[in-house]
């Protein structure tokens, strides 16, 4: 049954990939689903000249908090004024700073979210890399390294400073040294995306930090999705008893988390090996199926005990052959969460994700927008874009995938719904775009 399900999944992903253009043309000509309108999409730059803007969060009045990976947290107020609030070690111009915070590779100051009761409690949450809890660890890539944290702050009324830092998660794993893999520098596969779910709990996505044991070892906070309260304690109904904070495990590098408006179902967007990025409906206690450890599933030894890019990690090869060697969703696991979508063979680098909300989005309302950073490898096109994914009600397949015509091709790192039902997108090139539909 699992093998049949896997075949259908891969076939569906391939079919979606080759039908992008046809789907777009049909929607434009025929008015899309059930006669609903196809919206006119427009984009404009609202900020530029930033350094790796990673994430955004909005207040009710339209003020935008944003992170820059190697600098810190700032806010652009509704009036347009920019206040630099909280920097990392070495950053200049910030009202305050955390000298334990740093950036390296894919790590740094990443996710930012506002408490659902922000108007009353003024609380904000940040995900960042930190040296504060290294203790005696972090001496090699093969030991525990508590190098990522989640912090809470209070923001003052006029958005000019933050205070009352409290570290609510202190043990998310970090990769401290270079290893023998593509993109193998320190800070690799660092996760960092956060979101509040409809029940008011904080969800935190992490990465496998290029350590083979991580995704399937529930004694380590890596390759997991947390569901925690404002103090960092696990939801009482989380099913993974090894660590009450864990909602799911077996992930590679979670980059997007959002919740389907119609039913509150949680979905992740995740980096896969080469051309196997995935979008997955999460199941409490479920396994993402990623197991890059050497000497498992018929594999031999791998560089630095990590088989995530094998069997030919430095050169292009047929994606299906690579996927068979170390599959992103391994059907060996009985608790596997089958992905709804795989980026099978069409560039790679799925970043953040956000469900489109508001009637202005027409036929796209309720569909998932995903940023594709478009790493071309082994002859594949770069394909930097935003895709609109129409996920089936059961969350186990997609009905269609089309490109959002935003008019620019960038490395879309972060996506967030903002004021006026507009989609905001941050890019590695240093801009934040407002994408509107009408």
Where are the regions a protein language model picked out?
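Bacterial N-terminal signal peptides
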Residues: 10-19
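Blade-level signature of beta-propeller repeat domains, shared across WD40, Kelch, NHL, RCC1
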Residues: 414-438
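Conserved beta-propeller blade signature
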Residues: 63-67, 123-127, 201-205, 265-269, ...
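Beta-propeller domain segments
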Residues: 29-36, 93-103, 107-109, 117-119, ...
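Beta-strand-rich domains and repeat architectures in extracellular enzymes and scaffolds
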Residues: 45-71, 347-355
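Beta-propeller domains
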Residues: 65-89, 383
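Asp-box/WD-like beta-propeller blade repeats and closely related beta-sheet repeat scaffolds
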Residues: 138-195
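Surface loop/turn motifs at the tips and blade-to-blade linkers of beta-strand repeat domains
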Residues: 45-51, 87, 102-104, 169-171, ...
């Amino acid at each position: 049954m699992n093998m049949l399900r896997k075949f259908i999944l891969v076939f569906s992903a391939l079919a979606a990939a080759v039908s992008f253009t046809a789907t777009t043309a049909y929607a434009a000509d025929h008015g899309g689903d059930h006669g609903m309108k196809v919206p006119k999409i427009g984009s404009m730059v609202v900020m530029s000249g930033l350094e790796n803007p990673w994430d955004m969060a909005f207040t009710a009045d339209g003020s935008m908090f944003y992170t820059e990976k190697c600098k810190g947290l700032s806010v652009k107020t509704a009036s347009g004024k920019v206040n630099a609030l909280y920097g990392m070690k070495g950053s200049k111009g910030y009202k305050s700073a955390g000298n334990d915070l740093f950036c390296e590779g894919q790590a740094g100051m990443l996710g930012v979210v506002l408490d659902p009761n922000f108007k009353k409690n003024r609380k904000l949450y940040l995900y960042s890399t930190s040296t504060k809890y290294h203790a005696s660890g972090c001496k090699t890539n093969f030991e525990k390294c508590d190098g990522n944290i989640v912090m809470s702050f209070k923001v003052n009324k006029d958005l000019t400073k933050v205070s009352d830092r409290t570290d609510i998660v202190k043990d998310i794993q970090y990769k401290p040294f270079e290893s023998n893999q593509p993109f193998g520098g320190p800070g690799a596969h660092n996760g960092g995306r956060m979101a509040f779910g409809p029940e008011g709990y904080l969800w935190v996505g992490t990465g496998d930090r290029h350590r083979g044991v991580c995704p399937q070892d529930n004694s380590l906070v890596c390759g997991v999705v947390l569901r925690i309260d404002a103090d960092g304690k696990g939801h009482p109904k989380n099913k993974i008893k090894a660590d009450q904070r864990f909602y799911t495990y077996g992930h590679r590098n979670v980059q997007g988390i959002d919740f389907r408006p119609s039913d509150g179902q949680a979905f992740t967007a995740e980096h896969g090996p080469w051309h196997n990025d995935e979008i997955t409906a999460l199941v409490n206690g479920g396994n993402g199926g990623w197991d890059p450890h050497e000497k498992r599933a018929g594999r031999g030894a791998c560089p630095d005990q990590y088989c995530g890019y094998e069997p030919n990690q430095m050169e292009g090869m047929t994606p299906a052959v690579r996927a068979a060697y170390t599959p992103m969703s391994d059907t060996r696991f009985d608790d596997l969460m089958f992905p709804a979508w795989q980026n099978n063979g069409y560039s790679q680098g799925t970043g953040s994700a956000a469900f489109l909300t508001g009637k202005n989005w027409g036929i796209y309302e309720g569909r998932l927008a995903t940023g594709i950073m478009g790493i071309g490898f082994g002859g594949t096109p770069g394909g930097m874009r935003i895709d609109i994914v129409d996920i089936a009600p059961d969350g186990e397949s997609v009905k269609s995938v089309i490109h959002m015509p935003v008019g620019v091709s960038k490395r879309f790192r972060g996506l967030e719904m903002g004021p006026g039902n507009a989609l905001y997108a941050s890019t590695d090139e240093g801009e934040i775009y407002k994408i509107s539909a009408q």
